[in-house]
Amino acid sequence: SREHPLANKKRLSIEDLYGETLMMVKEGDSTVVDSIREEIRKHPQITIEDTPQFYDINVFNRCEQTQNIMITLDCWKDVHPALVTIPMDWDFPIPYGLLYALNPSQDVEEFIRIVKKENNTLFE
């Protein structure tokens, strides 16, 4: 919530979350979030509340109404007018991939070729 005591901070540390309830998808839904959960469990001063695998407006509303803190991505920063997104001081990168048809168009094939070349990454 924009009214939360931490809302004006530029970055948050794990210690900033002490005494807070942290909303996150339930264990097993995301390997990255599971890694974050393992780190959070080392800090019993933080309570974990499981949410559904996919956040919907009800989850965002609950976060705002309860003044809880929620694990989210930067892309959700404008999803709710009463919530604010603040980066954490931790290194848990989120992997992204490309999903395309088994028999892609020439344009898609060219795009994939460029991505492979630029990122020096192998796609299977």
List each model region and its residues:
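Acidic, Gly/Pro-rich loop/turn segments at junctions of secondary structure
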Residues: 1-19, 75-82
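Residues at the C-termini of beta-strands that transition into short coil/loop
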Residues: 1-2, 26, 52, 87-89, ...
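Secondary-structure junction motif
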Residues: 6, 14, 19-44, 108
